[in-house]
């Protein structure tokens, strides 16, 4: 089962790229803030028509809209149970990660540590793999460096000052965070948070 948080156009584009060979089916979880295109009827209709087409070609498709993020009444345990019951083992996440903190929480609580989710770079549509266990294992030192990036793109030297760590230590941490998809850089000399990094900090209460 593949789970997607999405806006309509990139969701369709990504699934077209993924193909269908060997997949058991798709569980689609559409959610976002009030402006999310997932809530718009045309977007729903386009997605439903697309996956109806897949179903017509023999692909087992399940479409399930859950408008979750931004909803103060969201029952996270209920959502987690629905995902677990659906047999989710990998997530493919679309769009701005600022909307996806709930999804990341569910992933970290429900999926086994060897599972993974993939975050999509909106500009290139490339997929970044992020193991669930790595999310659980990030220690406080790494979180301090992430927090130091909240104010905007920052150099390695300034990050060392802001996080009260040696520059060599910060350099090693940054390499791990870049590999995990939480930080981008250096470009050319500064590092910046990715949407996934911001969502992770939201999970940790910053």
Task: Give residue spans per PLM region.
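Long, low-complexity, Lys/Arg-enriched
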Residues: 1-88, 102-105, 109-206
């Amino acid at each position: 089962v593949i789970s997607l948080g999405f806006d309509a156009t990139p969701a369709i584009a990504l699934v077209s790229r993924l193909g269908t060979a060997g997949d058991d089916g798709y569980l689609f979880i559409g959610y976002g803030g009030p402006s999310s295109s997932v809530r718009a009827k045309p977007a729903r209709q386009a997605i439903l028509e697309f996956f109806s087409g897949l179903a017509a070609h023999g692909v087992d498709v399940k479409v399930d809209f859950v408008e979750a993020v931004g909803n103060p009444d969201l029952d996270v345990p209920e959502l987690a149970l629905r995902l677990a019951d659906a047999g989710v083992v990998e997530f493919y996440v679309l769009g701005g990660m600022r909307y996806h903190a709930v999804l990341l929480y569910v992933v970290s609580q429900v999926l086994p540590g060897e599972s993974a989710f993939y975050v999509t770079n909106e500009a290139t549509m490339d997929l970044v793999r992020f193991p669930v266990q790595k999310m659980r294992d990030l220690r406080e030192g790494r979180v301090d460096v992430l927090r130091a990036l909240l104010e905007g793109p920052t150099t390695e030297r300034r990050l060392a000052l802001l996080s009260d760590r040696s520059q060599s230590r910060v350099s090693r941490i940054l390499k791990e965070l870049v590999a995990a998809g939480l930080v981008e850089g250096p470009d050319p000399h500064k590092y910046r948070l990715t949407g996934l990094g911001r969502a992770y900090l939201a999970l940790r209460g910053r």
